[in-house]
């Protein structure tokens, strides 16, 4: 019976079984590599981003060939001495097995988990992708799965590489010895493909077919021939059609002029303290790729939609948004979407308001409700979120306002706050997170912070990083939220600095920020170090301990407690003191060396001297390497469903 099942299982595997990793010797090696991926019709641009865990700028394309080229960091695994890069894959259907579903999705670029588990919709699978690092003769190596008809000569011509190079890298002795499904490494001197224009994500719809053909579901050969034979009538049709187009353009110009005139008169003459805005009432706010169409260039009014004029505080008027403008909703829409702000829709309370679940224009959203006295924080969050867009940052959709209240509308992040999944999760109806999931969440949050610190046109500090401001989506991927305290960082000759009054949450505040009010990216890194300690220990940022000689309990920062513990844990082989502070909900299902590395990284992040703290780029690299090691550890526990599910069952 077992043999029959095994043979049946093998028969289901795709034809990409010949993909093999590239061997390596230097386990400290880290390089940039590319993966050539040809998506199927169900894999949109946003799906590809998620599958490979990359940003849009990390993807180039060869549109004519139908290929995307994904840039990934590649490293040498310490156990197998093979080059790989990691990602996660969310299974969509309860069909087949994890192995063949994963291999098929990545078209042979993946080295999936060695498991015979059945695929389960919603399950998150850790996947190793096959990559390579150049020996120094070329700038990059690109992983490419051979297709039917490929040859060394055709690949040489397509990618502008000599045949000798391809043969040398892949050890090809026979030019005809290339089989469809083989994994090849293409040496490159420059980035392949061209930058992918986001406007190509949703191509325009094709012209409609004639009604008679649509009724039958196709266009017959007779219809095609009839069209071809009617060439003598084309000039007359062109003339009539041209006149129709000109007339339509004239009508459109008149409508545009009317719209522009009405917008120039939109300022309130009756109230000198306010501005009048046109409010969209019926338009949707989701684009075809599934992302939120939140902040858009130009005016946010729609000529074919019902409009309403409302008064909005002058601080939110002209000049608040430099380029992009968020969508604006009516108070009535917000009130109806949240079921009149019912307690059953309440998601939680933040520093500056309450957050409610809402169903707005048939889409799930989160709505932050603030008093009008919080205009400064409201404006700060709107301005930042209209400039930063990243898969690990919560997306802004729009806002609404009345004389007394302000409302910010965000994407709804289904699993809620990380805090609820770390601190006594069972009492909140949550299942404890596994080690792999905690590692991935830490990396996601680090990437979001790295983005606002390093990769935006103007750099920002968040100033309120904590586990309640890190949200988890349905796949348990992390997104940073609540930018009400975010601050622009100015570059000076002595580095970056932003002088401000001290704001934030006790337990996460860096020493220099508390004493001098100097907010820098290193302030965020200190707070992130505290988050890492919470992820390891499952404890809150401030712990109540029994004070000696007094009746009142003492409140101590988690960072100071963990630093004291680490003094008695010099390495991963002698970490008995540290193990006492590891979250018992993980039930000892974690690699001790990886946990010790994250604890050490957290220790570096909370160093009293901000100069000695790593930057977020270094933190991301460290967490990526730790996750790779954790995945190797996970592979040794292939039969343990508690590890692979991402959640720890039981207890």
UniProtKB/Swiss-Prot annotation:
GO terms for molecular function: ATP binding; protein serine/threonine kinase activity; transmembrane receptor protein kinase activity. Its main location: membrane. The modification Phosphothreonine is found at residues 330, 500, 505. The keyword Hydrolase does not apply. GO terms for biological process: abscisic acid-activated signaling pathway; defense response; defense response to fungus; innate immune response; negative regulation of defense response; positive regulation of abscisic acid-activated signaling pathway; response to abscisic acid. Residues 196-216 are annotated as: Disordered. ATP binds at residues 347-355, 368. The chain crosses the membrane at residues 237-257. The active site is at residue 464. Residues 1-19 form the signal peptide. Residues 142-186 form the LysM domain. It is found in: Cell membrane. Pfam families: LysM, PK_Tyr_Ser-Thr. Residues 20-236 are extracellular. Residues 341-628 form the Protein kinase domain. The keyword Ubl conjugation does not apply. Gene3D superfamilies: LysM domain (3.10.350.10), Phosphorylase Kinase, domain 1 (3.30.200.20), Transferase(Phosphotransferase) domain 1 (1.10.510.10). Residues 258-651 are cytoplasmic. Keywords: ATP-binding, Cell membrane, Disulfide bond, Glycoprotein, Kinase, Membrane, Nucleotide-binding, Phosphoprotein, Receptor, Repeat, Serine/threonine-protein kinase, Signal, Transferase, Transmembrane, Transmembrane helix. The modification Phosphoserine is found at residue 468. Disulfide bonds join 24-76, 31-133, 74-131. It is a single-pass membrane protein. The modification Phosphotyrosine is found at residues 410, 513. Putative Lysin motif (LysM) receptor kinase that may recognize microbe-derived N-acetylglucosamine (NAG)-containing ligands. Belongs to the protein kinase superfamily. Ser/Thr protein kinase family. This is LysM domain receptor-like kinase 3. It comes from Arabidopsis thaliana. The lineage of its organism: Eukaryota, Viridiplantae, Streptophyta, Embryophyta, Tracheophyta. The gene is LYK3.
